[in-house]
């Protein structure tokens, strides 16, 4: 019986979680869940100068925001010194390691590989050959393990069956394969994801607009949109699907055989497109809750869902909400309606004012009934519906187009809507 899948995500707490790391975490998550296996979180914090606990905390927060849950961990390499020392001792006893001065003149433990090259198998690339491996440090002079040694020891101890990571680790994998063989332990299955490139074909960086996961979160991206887009950077659905509602659907649709080794190109506009699509699918209650932190003033009490429905179609980011809602709730220039449109605008505004006064709509259905009554009024007088509704829109918002009028009326409330209509009528009389 084949061993159950055990995968891991192993970030270094030297900064925030970036897109490449988030994709690696996602693909490990999908792989483990697809196979009914377990996913471990390991913090590779052996770099004492650069590793910070606050970075670790931020990485954990961002993984939680993405919805990526782990079955074990976090394990911290900085807390496992005795384990690494024990494995180094085995290599020393077997003549496969030795102590010598490092570049700083202090004593360190070096691995002496029995072979200077060889090959390992990659799930996407097949056989990968390597060579020219020199003796390298496995225990640094401060007692901390070097990256390649710690990774191998931990993957052995944690019974990792599959190592899924970025292509940039291919040079490390050759060294790690030699360590596995020296320790007499079978290697896990390796799978190296293709690089993520910018739109110009160069390695992805901040100059392409790429940010940390936290940066996207603070800008107003949804976790499900970011996950959706990241899943497509190196993977294709068998039927060409590109939109997925969230992790649960991605797990259900995941097919590891559709992973590719070619570089993927990051397109900021494509990510923005996915975010807008996911925003449109959100339930109004959740959307209102997510929008609130981006606003200086709270949404109108009792009309929170109407407010977000009013701007939903124009939202691309949660951070767009203040600007879009400000156009509706902010002050309107009374002169905006003066002189446009010509014809019976003043008469139409008077009719709208009377209807508001008599009906005082509080809900969407009542607002729709008011607008239907205004259309009937226009039809009885041989006026096109648009010629009656457009002056009302301009009076309420100062703009020629925008959200559906029923949302605007309910969002403003009958009193404010009435005031805006009266100010527009007065402005027309003065024009």
From Swiss-Prot:
Pfam families noted in UniProt: Anticodon_2, tRNA-synt_1c
Recorded superkingdom: Bacteria
Matches recorded under SUPFAM superfamilies: An anticodon-binding domain of class I aminoacyl-tRNA synthetases, Nucleotidylyl transferase
Motif ('KMSKS' region): 203-207
UniProt keyword list: Aminoacyl-tRNA synthetase, ATP-binding, Cytoplasm, Ligase, Nucleotide-binding, Protein biosynthesis
Family matches, as PANTHER family: GLUTAMATE--TRNA LIGASE, GLUTAMATE--TRNA LIGASE, MITOCHONDRIAL-RELATED
The protein's assembly and partners: Monomer.
Name recorded for this polypeptide: Glutamate--tRNA ligase 1
Lineage: Bacteria, Bacillati, Actinomycetota, Rubrobacteria, Rubrobacterales
